[in-house]
Amino acid sequence: TMWIGFGVIALWNIFKEKLNLNTNVAAIGALLLVLTAPLIMGFQNWDDHDRGSHQGSRDYAINFLESCEENAIIFTHGDNDTYPLWYAQEVEGIRTDIRVINVSLLGVDWYVNQLRYKMNDAAHLKLTFTPNMIKGNIRDYVPYVNNPSIDKNKYYNAKDIMKFISKDDPKIKAQTRYPYYVPTRKMSFPVSAEAVKTMNMTDAPDSLIVSDMRVDLRKASLQKNDLMTIDIIANNINDRPIYFAISVAPSAYLGFQKYFQQEGLTYRIVPVENVSGQPTQS
């Protein structure tokens, strides 16, 4: 832009001084000459840059949504994963019963608070943490602290762990230096037989279906988005189908990958453990 401006001034001086044109005519002539470059570029390159018929992103988003059962929750990761799905829902009205959750935004209080309300045809989410419990930087970082009273071989109900982390107990800070902490890396997520049946979770034989999904956290601490992911799964797994988009980074799986069942472009969390560690096929 700067060099175009210099070019206009130079041409204006040439027209004015060399061709003896008045100021207005010289300025118009210089401007017309300079405009030929972007006009030619526009005519020659329009077809190369026209995105009017490019629908790959839209089709990809619709495939994600159509991979889910009714009233589902799907975790996505980042803008490119999420915005096309929101477009399909908000603009084209496709699968508005699904709640799309961007795990990258779960560390932000205002975004989490939106999940407490119905969105289009998607019901609100059940959460342990109130708005004040996650306001601003509260619980942005929740470390794991070894607790001698905790049995290291036992899996504890994730709902109970979330309730423990939600407490604001001065005694905890006095004992650990932290206002809240994760007391165990072993969490269980009970799944009722009724939920398995009514939500058609899996076609696996009953002998392979577990009543408790057991997850081993490999992290030394939980960020707020990790905390909220666990809380959402713990509180909603018996009410709604829950999925991860296949494009989500493995670091966001939090150990659930051994319970993944691939359905279309998603991994659904089902109470069937994969010994191989690879998602089963539906």
Where are these regions (language model features)?
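ER/secretory pathway lumenal C-terminal domains and tails of membrane proteins involved
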Residues: 1-71, 86-282
